[in-house]
């Protein structure tokens, strides 16, 4: 089981490296990693388990964050209604954004990261809508359209696979700079 001590923090070179593509069929180690990353997200979103194991809540966890430089990330965006199915739940392997909106989007509260132990204020400007192509654990190619929060979460995780951290997208001179067409998501 992945715990907070297993998640590397900013300053570790793996977080700034270009991750390598994952080969199929998945090795036993890659299958275990994928399952463990999803288990972390599930446990971190359960208040009792999060408290028991000292987990920070997360909606995404990329392999580089656990010091494995591979293009794989677990994503679990819960529904607003606790009883509904998650908005998006999958392990995305070798993901590529194949199209995106011109319109930018950002979270009103900014973004956070399990690998960054400090608050960094500012709009993290991303695409409001994306079409994502990836492979699931079975090696099946998937294509999905995402908008708003799920699109932002996936872009954040894909950035990890390319050595980019969320604060790289914040305007250093004016962290809350926004064009008129920016979609702010609360």
Swiss-Prot record:
EC number in record: 3.5.1.88
Cofactor binding notes: Binds 1 Fe(2+) ion.
Catalysed reactions, as listed in the record: N-terminal N-formyl-L-methionyl-[peptide] + H2O = N-terminal L-methionyl-[peptide] + formate
Enzyme class at the top of the EC tree: hydrolase
Keywords (A to Z) from UniProt: Hydrolase, Iron, Metal-binding, Protein biosynthesis
Role this protein plays: Removes the formyl group from the N-terminal Met of newly synthesized proteins. Requires at least a dipeptide for an efficient rate of reaction. N-terminal L-methionine is a prerequisite for activity but the enzyme has broad specificity at other positions.
Any GO molecular function: peptide deformylase activity
Protein name: Peptide deformylase
Binding site for Fe cation: 113, 156, 160
Taxonomy of the source species: Bacteria, Bacillati, Bacillota, Bacilli, Lactobacillales
Active site: 157
Family stated for the protein in its record: Belongs to the polypeptide deformylase family.
């Amino acid at each position: 089981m992945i715990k907070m001590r297993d998640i590397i923090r900013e300053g570790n070179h793996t977080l700034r490296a270009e991750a390598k593509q994952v080969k199929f069929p998945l090795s036993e180690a890659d299958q275990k990693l994928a399952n463990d990353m999803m288990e972390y997200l599930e446990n971190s979103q359960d208040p009792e388990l999060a408290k028991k194991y000292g987990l920070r809540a997360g909606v995404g966890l990329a392999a580089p964050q656990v010091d494995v430089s591979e293009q794989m990330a677990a994503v679990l965006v819960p529904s607003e209604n606790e009883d509904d199915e998650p908005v998006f739940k999958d392990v995305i392997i070798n993901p590529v954004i194949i199209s995106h909106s011109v319109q930018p989007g950002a979270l009103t509260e900014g973004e956070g990261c399990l690998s960054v132990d400090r608050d960094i204020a500012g709009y993290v400007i991303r695409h409001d809508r994306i079409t994502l192509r990836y492979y699931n654990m079975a090696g099946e190619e998937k294509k999905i359209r995402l908008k708003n929060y799920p699109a932002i979460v996936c872009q954040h995780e894909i950035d990890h696979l390319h050595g980019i951290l969320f604060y790289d997208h914040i305007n250093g001179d004016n962290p809350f700079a926004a064009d008129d067409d920016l979609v702010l998501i609360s």
